[in-house]
Each structure stands twice: as C-alpha cells, then as structure tokens.
UniProtKB/Swiss-Prot annotation:
This is Dihydroorotase. GO terms for biological process: 'de novo' pyrimidine nucleobase biosynthetic process; 'de novo' UMP biosynthetic process. Its cofactor is Zn(2+). The active site is at D248. The modification N6-carboxylysine is found at K100. Zn(2+) 1 binds at H14, H16, K100, D248. The gene is pyrC. The keyword Amino-acid biosynthesis does not apply. It catalyses: (S)-dihydroorotate + H2O = N-carbamoyl-L-aspartate + H(+). Its EC number is 3.5.2.3. Signal peptide: none annotated.
Amino acid sequence: MTQKLTITRPDDWHLHLRDGAALAAVLPDTARQFARAIIMPNLKPPVTTVAQAQAYRARILAALPAGLQFEPLMTLYLTDNTTAEEIAAAKASGFVHGVKLYPAGATTNSDAGVTDIRRCYPALEAMQRAGLPLLVHGEVTDPSIDIFDREAVFIDRVMTPLRRDMPELKVVFEHITTKDAAEYVRDASGPVGATITAHHLLYNRNAIFTGGIRPHYYCLPVLKRETHREALVAAAVSGSPRFFLGTDSAPHARGLKEHACGCAGCYTALHAMELYAEAFDAAGALDKLEAFASFNGPAFYGLPRNTGTLTLEREDWELPAELPYGDTTLVPLRGGETLRWKAR
C-alpha cells in the first residue's frame, strides 16, 4: 500500500475565487496546493472584457500572501454581445487563456450568459482562428428538461451542432458529471477535453439526502447516479490526456448554503488534492493521479508543466468544520470529518 506520493505540482483548471474579502479568504488555500488555476469570470458584474480581466488579475495577485507562488489564468465571460475584436485582444493579452460559456441562468451569477449559441458564432469563429479555448458549462436551461438530464441533452442540442460547425475550436467540457459526457469527450474527434471535480469522483446523488438535506453537497451540475460516478472515475484513471483536474471549488457563506433557497457549490480548495488522492486510491490508480492533476491540463492549454512538486502522505487529520470567509464563515466539503491523505 502506497504511503507517500510525490507528484509534479498540480494545476486547477476550474476555480472560483470571488472578489474582495472573499477572495482574500480563499486564495491562500488554492495557492498552497496549485501553481496555476483557470479563474472563472462569473463575478457581479461578470468579467466580459480584457480590461476587466486585467484588473481582476491584479486584485488576485495583490491578495496573494507573501511566500506563495501562484499564477491566475484569466478567462472572459461569453455573452451574446462578445465581439471578434475582444477575442483578438484576449488572445494578444497573454493572460487570458479561455472564454467561458454559461447558458443564461444555468448556475451562480449566470444571468448575463448566452441565450442562443448562434448569436456568439462571430466570437466563436474568432476563437477557433486564434486557438483560444471555449470553456463550457454543459447544461441546458430549458425548464421542461429534468435537472438530472440537462448535461446529456446539452450534448445533443448544443455541443454536437457547435462542434460540427467549428471542428477546430478547442473546447473544455467543464465539470462533467455523466457517463454520457465522459464517453462523448473520450470518443470525440478534434480538440476536446474535460475537467472533473473531486466531489463528482467521490459521491453520487445520495450524498445530498443522507439523513436529511445536506446542502454542502449541493452543486451544479448536480451529483448524479452511481453509474455516472463510476464512469467519471474510469475516465479520470484511464490515462487519456483529454481528462484533467478542475476542482470547481465554489465558496459561499454558510448562511447562503444553509438556507431555504441555498446556493450551489462545494468548497474544496483547502483539501482538493487530498480528496483526489482518496478517489484515485479507492480506484487502485494512484499511479495515474500525476497525469490527471499535473500533465494533461498544461498539454491541452499549450502551457509548460510546473517544475515544483507536491507530496501526499497517507495520514489521518480532521478537516476544520468551518473556515473564515470575510466577515462570516464557510463550510468546506466534509467539514469536521477525518481525511485519509495529507498534502505537503
């Protein structure tokens, strides 16, 4: 049984850092484990221009504690009005590494998102020419579609036609949650990748309802059946370079999670690599963790691998039940419970 594992320092290819006091509270957790992260643009107001991305990047770097090295990889928020000129400026900036597609209303702060993908074709064609990846929240928002089916329907209604029209557009299918998505990415032609969260590798939808409503397991896309979780694990440990680490760590104040209409999102930045190690260990595939966490993402994005290392040791420790979050607190996923791995 492996007791200690040292890997190339990993990256997080899907992260929510928020802004202001919340940013200052959560950024150190990510920077202690990850060298780089793709930063989601769904602030209020959203990050829709290169100038806004540059300003947000400066705020992130200003909040980084002394002694920690971390590079934020910025993204733009795609809207119906995003121009080809803004895409060209994003590519030329050197610090914008993708453009995020949120179907309007699909998740937290997505109200300004895309209402019809066809309205974005001029911008998407510019992205295809520039080699700038499209990062996709892959769920339809049609209220007639069951929430557990929205990812699979998105593949048929949006992803397949989009990739038929733009076969060379680099696409990341973010935080995939279904067997359908895993098989789509595995079998697709052209430049397609996918991020997978730790919580979707570890849990199925029963976790939300064990002994009552468990709001800290509620995220979007929502956890799915066990057959889907098993398919995600199989994809993550397969060795395919198309699958890579993206925590989708999404901090919310405790009172906004434990609420009559609670926010979606799991906070995992503090203990992300410990959770991934647990998932890969359970699958008997610790030897596949480094490629998933440290190699596949940089290869897809055309970036060099990191030069530092991170060590994981088999060691029991208790995760704090709650963490400071501005003038309030947040509850990490599995808060107050014992974890079996420790990152150093």
